């Protein structure tokens, strides 16, 4: 799959995606124009390895955070690996350009709810952009906006009894500062045929499964670039759906490579929900994903 990815996309400077994934350097891999196709490829390669080593692995439902929503849609058969890789490579380039043009940042807010996050934004914006961008888990919200507003947000959070930390990111993702990227992504999505999903896939914007209308799905993917990711709502709704569908005992939760960040967030959302991570696929599980 990595060899196929190298044939589909070419990174800035002619770097091969496979070499960047396995050998770095980290500084290059951390650029969103490189990290997005890398994450997409790693996730689908991980699933393919699980199937190869352990046999058929039916996907009962899929969700992914930010870029991961494209991985989830590919697993559900909405588009092919190659189509998805081209889309996320375009998304990464557009967001990288918007980030460099807007000089923004992001701040992790610990301990507050949505109302407190809005209060911090109101106090720190001072005419600039500063908005909640990621609702990751209860008590864990990320703000996004102009760099100066992010600096002020750290101070404002402290006065409200909250902890805040600036994140080492390339830009103000999931905020209005990404509007140029959203416009470009809308044009890119027009040229890709979306097929009916084989399973429910949750929208980062609504926190609910996508409907059957391809145009609405594409519009939500565009909105996702400039609107907050409601990951906690996605997970809560997915768990409720799994229980209502009678899948609690048969459909296990799997986090595809790389990393285990989502497993950590799920502990905050529902400690009873067990997530299996697959940074390396040495013991594939023949359970529904």
Question: What residue ranges belong to the model's regions?
Answer:
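Structured loop/turn residues at beta-strand edges in well-structured enzyme cores
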Residues: 57, 196, 248
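Alpha-helix termini
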Residues: 12, 53-54, 125, 241-249
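Alpha/beta catalytic cores of group-transfer enzymes, especially the acyltransferase/condensing modules
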Residues: 7-13, 25, 75-228, 264
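FabD-like malonyl-/acyl-CoA
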Residues: 1-119, 167, 252-288
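Phosphate/ATP-binding catalytic cores across multiple sugar-kinase/actin-like superfamilies
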Residues: 42-53, 92, 225-242
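Conserved catalytic block of serine-dependent lipid acyl chemistry
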Residues: 174, 184, 210, 230-262, ...
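Post-His helix in hydrolase/transferase enzymes
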Residues: 181, 288-289
């Amino acid at each position: 799959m990595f060899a196929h990815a190298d044939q589909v996309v070419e990174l800035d400077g002619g770097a091969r995606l496979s070499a960047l994934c396995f050998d770095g350097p980290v500084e290059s891999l951390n650029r969103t124009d490189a990290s997005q196709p890398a994450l997409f490829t790693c996730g689908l390669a991980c699933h393919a390895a699980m199937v190869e080593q352990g046999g058929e692995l039916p996907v009962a439902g899929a969700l992914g955070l930010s870029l991961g929503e494209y991985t989830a849609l590919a697993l559900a058969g909405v588009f092919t690996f190659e189509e998805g890789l081209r889309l996320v490579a375009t998304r990464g380039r557009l967001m990288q350009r918007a980030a460099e043009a807007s000089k923004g940042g992001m701040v992790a807010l610990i301990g507050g709810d949505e109302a407190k996050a809005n209060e911090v934004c109101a106090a720190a914006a001072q005419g600039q952009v500063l908005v909640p961008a990621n609702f990751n888990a209860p008590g864990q919200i990320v703000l996004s906006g102009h760099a100066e507003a992010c600096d002020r947000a750290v101070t404002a959070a402290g006065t409200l009894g909250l902890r805040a930390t600036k994140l080492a990111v390339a830009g103000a993702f999931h905020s209005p500062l990404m509007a140029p990227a959203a416009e470009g992504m809308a044009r890119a999505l027009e040229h890709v045929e979306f097929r009916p999903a084989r399973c429910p896939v949750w929208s980062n914007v609504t926190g609910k499964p996508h409907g059957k209308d391809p145009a609405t799905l594409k519009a939500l993917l565009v909105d996702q670039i400039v609107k907050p990711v409601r990951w906690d709502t996605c997970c809560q709704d997915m768990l409720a759906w799994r229980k209502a569908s009678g899948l609690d005992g048969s459909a296990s939760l799997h986090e595809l490579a790389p990393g285990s960040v989502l497993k950590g967030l799920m502990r905050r959302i529902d400690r009873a929900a067990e997530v299996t991570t697959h940074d390396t696929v040495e013991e594939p599980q023949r359970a529904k994903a």
